[in-house]
Amino acid sequence: LPFVTGSDGEFTVLGRGTPEIYINGRKVRDKTELDRLQANEILSAEIITTPGVQYGSSVGAVIRLHTIRKRGQGMSGSFYTDYSQGHEPIGNEGISLNYRTGGLDIFVKGDFAEINNHTTNISSQDIYASSDWNQSTENKSKQTYRTFNGELGFNYEIDEDQSFGMRYMPGTNIGNAHTTNEGTTLILQDGKEVDHLHALRQTDAHTGWWQAANGYYNGTFGKWNIDFNTDYLYGRDRIRQYAENNGIEDATSSNRVRNHLYAAKLLLTAPLWKGKLSFGTEETFTNRHDVFLQSGFSADADDRIKQTMLSGFIDYSLPLGKFNILAGLRYEFQQTDYYEKGIHQDDQSPTYRDWIPVVSIRYTSGNWFFALSHRTLKYSPSYDMLTSAVTYQNKYSYQSGDPFLVPQIHRATFFDAGWKWVNFSLSYDHCWNMYTSYTRPSR
């Protein structure tokens, strides 16, 4: 696909950021699902670099994958295995079984993966305060973990115009995910060495069973099409960290996290005049509880964040000869409730109401295309950015978030052009409330 780079479930669209990926109209919420999708199962792939308002305000690009619908009756199955060798080996094995009768398709899938990652990082950090500090670090990191992912569900075609289905997707780490970071750090103050550390940090993450469920319905009634999807996700993690410097214990911590997500989306489309009208609603409810305990290097934290996102959208696309015009508007209501140790924090619990417009025009002639678009993008801070927990990096560095962060707003204009396999993109982006990280002396 043009403009797409990346691998192993991590993809970027040049100039648009991380894409939202759909398989047969269903949003992919777990990137390991892409690892389990085999190339010979894909019927078609489409990239949308100017997503309409049916997609969230933070979506800069969309990749839509359609798989081959298996035909025939009775039982079928497949087995696959992948192996790759870098500094460490990575293996992946899976099995898939299908039973089809009439319009009913029942499927069971299982996937086992063994992952070994090895990285080397060399960094230098300068801090200018009452003294000038330099921190030079060479660090080697090794991560090992094993995972199991399963999938059980069915699809049912009532007739050629209607279908529905459900799937349940459990998964877990087999044992702990173990990460070892080991390296040296040289600390200079005003050009003079004040410390030389040999640091060792070990992290063990135990993931309980995560669970996901999805249901869908797609139907056509006359000129109207109805597409409905609903999702549920649950996951929990327990992370323990141990750090030492020059063979002496310096810090320990533990972190327990629970996540819930409920989401639903309804999309209706119908022809209108010479074009197509689309409108619908989208709702997302999340609940995250994060408990952080430490050995005295900072403060314990007990944060809970509940978020409600309600959206309504409408757009209209109109083909006019070699031109295609799209205009749409999305309304988003976002409410956040932030709790510290069970107490609601009013000043950290904002409510936002935003209008998200999208407009584009595209010209296509033979092997040429030209496109001009303008849209608003809104990026909400991640949970890690909002946390009040102070986590250990090394003897001299700690890291924390900011519960007072507000959404980052972009007004972006794009010009795209292409001829055969040659593509060109130019963009202008005006950003408000831009996120950044900074270093300051401890208080």
Regions found by a protein language model. Name each.
Residues N149-G175, L197-K341, T364-F369, F424:
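Face-selective signature of the C-terminal outer-membrane beta-barrel domain
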Residues P89-E93, T144-F148, T207-Q211, R258-Y262, ...:
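Residues that define the transmembrane beta-barrel architecture of outer-membrane proteins
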Residues E88-N117, D132-T179, Q211, G219:
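Transmembrane beta-barrel wall of Gram-negative outer-membrane proteins
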Residues Q202-D204, A301-Q307, D347-P350, K378-C431, ...:
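Outer-membrane beta-barrel signature, preferentially recognizing the C-terminal barrel domain
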Residues L1-K27:
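Extracytoplasmic beta-strand/coil segments of soluble accessory domains associated
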Residues G9, T32, I47, S58-Y80, ...:
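N-terminal periplasmic accessory domains that precede
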Residues T119-S131, A177-V194, R238-G247, H289-F297, ...:
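Outer-membrane beta-barrel translocator domains and adjoining extracellular loop/strand segments
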Residues N24-G52:
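Short acidic/polar hinge/loop motifs at secondary-structure boundaries
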